[in-house]
Amino acid sequence: RQRQMCIRDRLIMAITSVALFVHIVVICAASTREVVANKEFVWYNGKRPITYSLPGSVSPVVTVALDMFKGDMQQVTGVLPQKTLFGTAVINIIQLDKNKSILRDLRKDGIPVDSIVARKDAFFIKIRENQLLVVGSDGRGTAYGILELSRLAGVSPWVWWGDVTPMRKERLTLPADYSTFQSPSVEYRGIFLNDEDWSLQPWSWKNFEPSDIKGRIGARTYKEIFKLLMRLRANAIWPGMHGITTPFYFVPGAKEAADSCGILIGTSHCEPMMRNNVGEWKVNERGDYNYITNREGVQSYWIERLKEAGPYENFYTMGMRGIHDSGMEGVKTLQEKTDALQQVIDDQRKLLSKYVDKDVEKIPQAFVPYKEVLQIMENGLQLPEDITLIWCDDNYGYMTRLSDEEQQKRSGGAGVYYHLSYWGRPHDYMWLCTTQPGLIYSEMKQAYDCNARRLWVVNVHDLKPAAYDLELFLDMAWNINSVSPSTLVEHQKSWLCREFGKEAGEKLLPAMLEFYRLCGIRKPEFMGWNQVELDKKKYTKGWSPVKNTDFSLTEFGGELDRYLESYEAIKEILSEVEPMIPQERKDAFFAQIKYPVFGAAAMSTKILEAQRARCISPGSCDTTLWTRESQLMAACAKSIKAYQEIRDLTDYYNNELADGKWKYSMCHNPRDLYVFYPPKVPVWLTDKEIEKYASLKRTKSLPLAEAVKDSCIVSNACDYTSASKGVVTIQSLGHSMNAVSVPKGKSITFEFDCLWDGEAILRTAVIPTQPNDKGDIRFSVSIDGEKPRICSIKEPFRSEGWKQNVLRGQAVRETGHQLTKGKHTLSITALDDHVLIDQWMIDFKPDRMFYVFPVQPTY
C-alpha cells in the first residue's frame, strides 16, 4: 500500500512538471499579433473575467494574497477573477521554492530564475507572448508579485485601512514590453505597534471585534494589520506591549494569522525571548524579574514561550532590561551589569539552540543597545557575530548611533528602530503623524549606507494617521532607490494622485508640502511650549503648564499672524479640492488629508489666539498691545472656536466616517496632556458671543519682503551662490523644506549685500542630527575669509539643549561679526559627517524676540 502511494505521488509530480512545461510552451507559442499591433498588453478587456492559473504548491501567504487580489479585481472590474487551466489563463503564478522541477524550463524561456531564487521575498513579472507571468522566489515574494498586480490596476495599499475605494475600470493594460524584477533592500521590514492605548486598541476591542476582554486587539484586527503589511511589502511586526493591551500570545489565532500572512513576530528592546513582560510577568506568582536572584524562574518563563513560538517565524530579542523601559534589576556597577548581561545572553543562546534550532546562528536574533545597554556593550560585552545590532533614533527621528566600520562586518548585520510617534520627554506626539518626509529619507538612507539592512522597524501608535510617512519608510525598506533627495516631492505627489486622482492630487501637493513645513516648524502637540516628565515635586504630574509661545505678535510684521495665515491658505486649497474628490474617496480624503490639516490648523489657532488675547487684554504686561475690546473678544472667540473644532472633527472621525467603521480610533487628547485642554483666555465667551466675534478678521501680517527690511539679512541654505562637490539639497526637510547636506570638509558659499554698519549676530539654523559614532556634529562659519568660527550642535541626550532642538526641529547657533555696508561672502563648512544646513540670518538687532526665520520657503 505504501508502495502504491509512493508511485501515485511520483506520478502526480511528473504530471505537474509536464503540465508546467506544456504551459510555458503554450505561452511561447501564443499569438502576438494583438500585442504588436497595439503596443500594449490587455489583461482585462471589459468583457471576460480576469483568469489566472496557480500550478503546483504554494505557501499560505500566497493563498491570502490571491484572495486579496481577487477581491481587488472584483472592485475594479465588477467581476471576480476565475481560475483556469494551464496555457489559457491571462495571469500565471509560480512560487519557485515550491516548484523546483520547473526551474530548468523557466531558464530556457529566458526567465532569470537564478537571480530570483538567490533573493528572499523577490518577484519577477513579465509579459510573455500575450500572457502575464508572475514568479516569486518564495511565498512572500510570490504574494508581493500578486499584490503588485493590484497596484498596477490602481488599487491603493490603503484600500481597507484608508477607505481608498478602487475606481472602476473598463480596461486594464500594460506596455507590451512590461517587466519588473523586485527584491527587498532590507531583509526584514515592519512596524512596532506602540502607545496604542487611545487609538488602535480601543477601536479593536470596542468596535471592530467587540470583546468582553478589555484591551484585547483581536485576531481579526491583527489579520487586517498583516494584510496591510503585505500590501506595503513588509514582513515583520512587534505587537503592542502596553499593560492595558492583551499580550499578543494571549490572543487566540493571532500567531496563526501572522503565519498565514508571512509576518515574522519580534519584540521590543525590553521584551527578550518573545515575552511581553508588562502583561505577562506577575511578580506575585513568579517572584522578582531578577536574573541574579531568580535565574531559574526567569529561564522557565522564557522556555514556556520558546516552546510555543518555536514552530513559527520569529526575530528573537536578546539580553535583558527591567520589566518595562528600565535598567536590569539586581546589578549596580557597570561591571556587574556587564557580567550579568553576558550570562543572560550566553544562557539565551543555549535555550534557543535547545528549543528552536540546534544551529543557533540560523535563528534571527536582535540586540538593542538602547540607553544604558550601549554603555554595557562598550564595556566588553561579547556579542556573537550573528546577532543583529538594532540602532535607535532619539525618539524624535534623529539617529543617535550606527555601526562603525568593524561592526558593519558582523554577519548578523544591523537594523534600525525608528519613531513616527512617541510618548515621553520633552513632549509626546501621538495625535497626528507629521514627521517630515525629508527627515525620514535622510536618516534612513544614512542608516542603510552604514549597512543597517537586516531589520527596519518603525514605531507607530496607529496605522491610519501615519499612512504617508509609514508608506515612505517601507518603500525605502523595500527599495532604497525608490526615492532620492530630489524626488521626495514627486514621491508625495504620486501618492496623492494615486489616493485621490491626478487632478486632485496635483492640486493637493502644495498644500501638503506647506502642511509638513508648518508642522516642521512646530508639531501641533508641541504648541503649548511646555514639557512632560519633569520634576513632580515642582510640577503636578511632572507636566509644566501651557505658556506663551515664542511666536511674536509684532516682530517681522507679525510672525504669529503669518503662521496662522499659512494654515488658512492650505485650508482654502483643501476646500477647493474637496468637491473634486469622488464620492467613494470622500472618507479617505477626510482621514488622510482634511482631519490632520484642519486639526493642526485649529490647534495653532487655539494656542496662538489665546496668546494674543492674553497679550492684548487689560492688565497685560505689554501695554503697547492694548487694543479695543472687540479685538480681545475676537481672539478669545477664535481660540475657543478652534478648540471646539478639534472636538467636532474628532467626533465626525469616530462616529460618521465610513458609517462608524473607525469609532474609538481617533483621540484628540492622548494622555489628556495640557496642550489639549481648553484654551487659557481672559474671557470665556458664550456661544452667541463666539458666533458674533469669531468672524472678525484679524490684522494681516506684512509681506516678508517688507518685513525683513528691518536690520536683517536672511536666506535659506539651498539658495547658496556656490557649493563644493557632493553638496546635496534634500527636499521636504527643515523650516526651509530644502535643507542642504554638506559632506565633511565641504562648504556652501553665499554672496550678500549689507545695508548697515556695525556689530551683528549670525544665526545659523541646522537640522539637529546626532553624531552616529562617538564624535561630534560641527560646522564653521566665516565672513569675507575671516578666521572660521566653529560651532557644535552636539547635545547630551535629554539635556535642555537637546529638548529645545527636537521641539523646534532646528539647532540654532549664534556668532558675532563686525560688518560694513557693501558686498560680503559667507562660507559655511561642515567639519563632521551628517551636517544639514537649513537657514541663516544676519541680525543687527540681536535682542529681538522671534521664532521663525523670516524667509519664504523654497518648494
Q: How would you describe each model-predicted region?
A:
Residues 1, 8-37:
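Bacterial Sec-dependent N-terminal signal peptides
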Residues 1-7, 627-699:
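Short, small-residue-biased leader/transition segments that mark boundaries at the very start
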Residues 29-183:
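Contiguous, structured surface segment used for ligand recognition
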Residues 112-293, 310, 366-370, 378-398, ...:
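Feature activates predominantly on carbohydrate-active enzymes
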Residues 172, 249, 257-259, 284-411, ...:
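Gly/Pro-rich turn-and-neighbor structural signature
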Residues 230, 235-238, 245-248, 253, ...:
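Structured mid-domain segments that build the active-site/substrate or prosthetic-cofactor binding neighborhood
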Residues 567, 574-647:
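Ordered core of a single globular domain
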Residues 673, 680-859:
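Extracytoplasmic
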